[in-house]
Amino acid sequence: MLENKNHKKMSLSGKSLLMGTLSTAAIVLSASTVNAATTNADNVTKNQTVAVSATTTNNETNNQVSSSSEKTADSKTEKDTNLTSAATKEVKADAAKTTSPVNNVKTVADTTTTTKETTDNTEKSPVNFSADVKKNDAVKQDEKAATAVKANTEVKANETSTKSASKDNKAELKGQIKDIVKESGVDTSKLTDDQINELNKISFSKEAKSGTQLTYSDFKKIAKTLIEQDARYAVPFFNASKIKNMPAAKTLDAQTGKVEDLEIWDSWPVQDAKTGYVSNWNGYQLVIGMMGVPNTNDNHIYLLYNKYGDNNFNNWKNAGPIFGLGTPVIQQWSGSATLNKDGSIQLYYTKVDTSDNNTNHQKIASATVYLNLEKNQDKISIAHVDNDHIVFEGDGYHYQTYNQWKKTNKGADNIAMRDAHVIDDKDGNRYLVFEASTGTENYQGADQIYQWLNYGGTNKDNLGDFLQILSNSDIKDRAKWSNAAIGIIKLNNDTKNPGVEKVYTPLISAPMVSDEIERPDVVRLGNKYYLFAATRLNRGSNDDAWMAANKAVGDNVAMIGYVSDNLTHGYVPLNESGVVLTASVPANWRTATYSYYAVPVEGRDDQLLITSYITNRGEVAGKGMHATWAPSFLLQINPDNTTTVLAKMTNQGDWIWDDSSENADMMGVLEKDAPNSAALPGEWGKPVDWDLIGGYNLKPHQPVTPIPNVPTTPEKPENPTTPNTPDTPHTPTTPNTPDTPRTPEVPTTPVKKTTQSELRS
């Protein structure tokens, strides 16, 4: 979701050096300073040009330091000599003004300046002057020259004294940053007091305060990957001639109540909350999508349906807006949905109140949606909606609230409490993962610029990035407000009327780096949880990175991803930086995509189906070119926490990958006049509206052809050695026939004893 979020673009005209021209010790130097010096040099007299040239030389040296940080003693001596020479020449030239017009001064690099000036003036003297007059003039010139040399000596002495006093009072680097600056090859004697004071503010806290961090270094790597258009991550090219508006998007509009040709963008299927598979509801697949009239603040969610497993884009039907007609003030944005045991849909969505001056007050909400099915007419309709209520608006500590946001710079600061994704863990506990902004636990503000942990690169790289931010007013302003987060809450056991049982610290946060990471999506593959989210790099602080992406590709969108053994914590970035998908074509082409959403492939724990919408909203690709569902494609999840885009593509609007899904005709190429070109006629080289960028440096790329899902023939095992022939067992001897037991003797009948004596015997 982007276009109607009331996110005002920050001015880029404010790019200026905050701390003046950086010295040779600075790692980053704005090119505008050198350009300004060069421009001014064209408008000054020759005697001034020497000083400007010396400054320019030092600025050029700064750029060399920026790329290497290795400075030899010879180069330092040369720079100091240039500065001294320039100062000396200025003094000599000024002293000579008493005898010669400025225009007649000939500036040279040694002490012959005065002599040459004298010679020039002598040559220009009238020819009728007597020799005595000339001699007297020469004496006067010599006296004045001597005075100039004396003045120059005094000035140099005063400069030396001033520099010595300044050195004694110079600020000093302290603690860990002192070692880092030294290790980075920076000459600390060239740092200004302002730079030193700023560097001394840096905090070296070792622990992330709000989950896994998307760092400044990660952001640069993502932009670099986008610019390189690596086929492992670049969104595959689609055949522009095959893309069409969604037939089911012609329906009653929620705001006007009239039949309109609507656009459709952020969409999600009704899924099993534990497996993520698309649910089979009475033989149908159900998808909920944001729809609205083009170029209008019209954002509402609709229910769409098709036979389960049907890949035909034309067969999708529209059950209408879930929350009815006539709701222009209260709108609905992205979310997720799952089935209840009774067949109703439990919907999680973003309720947006626009009544406060269109500031888009976002709240995570839930509702139970009941459906009617008329099988004989192949028709699904919405019966009624119950339990519509707010689940979460932020707690202020882990997640920023609307009231906290209202106290900030609303024009530059993005508000986010949206896009709730439902997932059940292995034990059946239910959670919502959502887009947010960090709260006071790790809040936005200028102090984030001084958190070393936010940078994420080597010490040398971090130092350069720190100075870059301080030297660019727009980057610094963006960094101050950036606090995007992907949050998580645990719900209670009331399935149809859920509330919050526990609020966790964010899974991902980007303080100082980005102010918008949206549409989170968590899927469980095997025993691991994979978290994905969409982002636009121009919501980040690093202007240089996303502007370079715009220049190379004409767009700056991406999908990032992370993996963890636990749902609620411990995520690490995929592909090292978190990059999973990057833009391939300019934002105003028919085949530009966004809002990537990963759906598990049934029977596979190493592949995902990537869905999105195609063609940016507002008819930026041309009149009648509406936002619509894109073809889907496969993403391979590798065991080493890397990913690969596969050359497997579907029709538009395919949410279930099966044997009938693939359609190679939807694949495009980066060739201007090819029948399956990724660009429509006239799109090639067309500038993007927001920056009027042309001449893209697009590169062709080919997704990887996946290995068929069949068992591979195992390697032929070595022939086993023939075992030794076992010994033939001996035939046992016939056992002896046992003796016939003797017949026991028959006992005699005892004599009955009757007398006492007989009994005793």
From Swiss-Prot:
Keyword Metal-binding: yes
Thermal dependence: Optimum temperature is 55 degrees Celsius. Activity drastically decreases at 60 degrees Celsius.
Record's protein name: Inulosucrase
Active site, renumbered: D266 (nucleophile), E518 (proton donor/acceptor)
Keyword Glycosyltransferase included in the entry's annotation: yes
Residues the record lists as binding Ca(2+) 2: D413, Q444, W481, N483, D515
Chemical reaction(s) catalysed: [(2->1)-beta-D-fructosyl](n) + sucrose = [(2->1)-beta-D-fructosyl](n+1) + D-glucose
Organism: Lactobacillus gasseri
Activity regulation remarks: Calcium ions are required for optimal activity, but do not seem to be essential since addition of EDTA causes only a 30% drop in activity.
Keywords for the protein's UniProt record, in alphabetical order: Calcium, Carbohydrate metabolism, Glycosyltransferase, Metal-binding, Secreted, Signal, Transferase
Disulfide bonds: none
Enzyme class: transferase
Disordered: annotated span: 54-130, 150-171, 701-761
Description of pH dependence: Optimum pH is 3.5-4.5.
Role summary: Fructosyltransferase that catalyzes the polymerization of the fructose moiety of sucrose to produce inulin polymer and a broad range of inulin oligosaccharides ranging from DP2-DP13. Is also able to convert raffinose into a fructan polymer and fructo-oligosaccharides (FOS) in vitro; however, L.gasseri strain DSM 20604 is unable to ferment raffinose. Can also transfer fructose moieties of sucrose to maltose, leading to maltosylfructosides (MFOS). Also displays sucrose hydrolase activity.
Biased composition (Basic and acidic residues): 71-81
Compartments (UniProt record): Secreted; Cell surface
Signal sequence interval, chain numbering: 1-36
Residues given in the record as substrate binding sites: W265, S334, R418, D419, E516, I517, E518, R536
Compositional bias per record (Polar residues), positions renumbered to this chain: 54-70
Homology family: Belongs to the glycosyl hydrolase 68 family.
GO cellular component, one term: cell surface
EC numbers, comma separated: 2.4.1.9
Lineage: Bacteria, Bacillati, Bacillota, Bacilli, Lactobacillales
Record-linked CDD domains: GH68
Matches recorded under InterPro entries: Glyco_hydro_68, Glyco_hydro_beta-prop_sf
